[in-house]
Amino acid sequence: VVESLKRHGRLTQIELAGSTGLSPATVSNIVKELTAAGVLHTSFTSRSGRRATLVALARRVGLVAGAHFSTRQLHIAIADATRTTVAETVVPLAPGHRHDAELDRLTLLLGDMVESLGGQISDLLAVGVALPAPIDPRTGMVSTPGLLPGWEGVDVAESLSARIGRPVFVDSEANLGGLAEAREATGRGATSSVFVRVGHTISAGLVVDGDLFRGVSGKTGQIGHVTIDENGPVCRCSNRGCLEMYAAAPALLALFPESEGMQRLTDLLAASDAGVSTAHRVIADAGRHIGIAVASLCNLFDPELIIVGGELAQAGEILIAPMRHALERSALAATGGLPEIVAASFGEWGETRGAITMALDHVSVDADVAARLA
């Protein structure tokens, strides 16, 4: 019952019976016992038209934290066991940031945030971290050289855990963005979904039945390094003509002369919103390139839903409509139709929420947690 609530969030007792395979009577007895122990909290709902008992983990079970190191920003959030955010902050990151300095900073910020809630860092049950690169689940390190130079060769989870004395878990930003959407938002009803993250880099997270598909070395979903032109420019991964060289933020900004002041992705988005035709065209062309790569991904994995997130997703249909058209032209036809392409629900906080979800997945409500509730 506890594992099902960690995975799905709030559920009615009937939904709990369905997700666990237990009888309604057994679920009712377990809920009563765990509610009395302070592990669960119950309330009433009529969301299905009938009055029902809604069950969730009790907030006092403890706190978990999520952190997302993107290319330019660090997002941090602390949530209770119901995934309700109780503190959050965003700080800028310098280009080419390195693990040592940034993990030191994250340690200080986590301590300050927990103290502002009247606690201490030891109150955190677990911490999840999202990084802008694939992570090898066997080693905990960046799996591909060149994608995140300042973080290579480091077991980030182990390094941060040594600083804060709490369990830490690490995955890629695309995986965790996809996990958040699949568990809590747009992809919740889908049996399989792909979260395509488009910003300073391009990558994808594949989710099947609510669980991530990572591959042997964590490189699943690296569509930013699908070859678009084998004679194209050299990519940071050392290959030529990768999708990122045509559709990621650095490539898009490089299309404008310095005199136009397109220094950041926010400049491009603002220009597009203001109706600047060249900005609109650049984003639309990026969407077309990405859509062609997504079509290949669909031919390989046949997902039910495509969810688009990341910084460039703020362009909305200017980006997504060309993706949709490219998918229709390039993907194999299916009797049930092609997967729907939709915008992500969580915006800039999706990857952080996914990190929180991953952290909560690893929390065991055992004797130690029960002792906190006594």
Regions found by a protein language model. Name each.
Residues L54, V64-H68, L124-G128, S193-R197, ...:
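Short glycine-aspartate micro-motif
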Residues V2-T45, R51, A56-S122, T186, ...:
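ATP-binding/phosphotransfer module of carbohydrate and carboxylate kinases, centering on a glycine-rich
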Residues A190-Y246:
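Glycine-rich phosphate-binding loop of actin/hexokinase-like ATP-binding domains
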Residues D80, P137, V207:
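Short, acidic, Ser/Thr-enriched surface-loop or helix-capping motifs
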Residues T85, T89-S192, I318-R329:
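Glycine-rich phosphate-binding loop and adjoining helix at the ATP-binding site
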Residues P134-P137, N175-G178, S203-A204, F213, ...:
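Short, active-site-adjacent cap segments at secondary-structure transitions
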Residues T42, V168-S172, L206:
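General beta-strand structural signal in soluble alpha/beta enzymes
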Residues L131, S172, V198-H200, A249, ...:
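Short secondary-structure boundary segments
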